[in-house]
Amino acid sequence: MQEPLRIVVIISDPALVAEGDEQAQAIEERSRLLRIGLLEAGYNLVATLPADVFLTERLAQLQADMVIVDAESDARDALEHVVMATRDARRPIVMFTNDSNTQHVNEAVAAGVTAYIVAGLAPERIHPILTVAMARFKREQALLA
């Protein structure tokens, strides 16, 4: 039997979230649903981390197989940290967001995001999304080899 994927979820920096903010509460609920969906699907959720300057070292220590970015208002900053943290040890990056702006989608894919999922965080969809993301990542890596 294959070991479950080791997944690290990157979240919005909690210091940037104002208490009582409805958007922040919606983001927190989405993040909770994501974590529940990962655990229910049998994934090994090894950490939930903020996107910060320590991310490269943390990802190296945790040896994650896949990185999931769950961010909204600071998604660009989070993505920049994730891309920098994974440039030497490539791994699939899946981004869950409510931002359907075409320019942001294109920028994320150009930066190395394997799957950019807009408004698709139903727990039952997580496993198929991650399966496709991993298959796409492996295919891209084979083409680069």
Predicted regions and their residues:
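Conserved phosphotransfer microenvironments
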Residues: G20, A26-S31, A51-E57, D65-M84, ...
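Conserved phosphotransfer cores of two-component systems
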Residues: A60-L62, M84-R91, A111
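C-terminal output helix
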Residues: Q103, L121-L130
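CheY-like receiver
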Residues: A135-A145
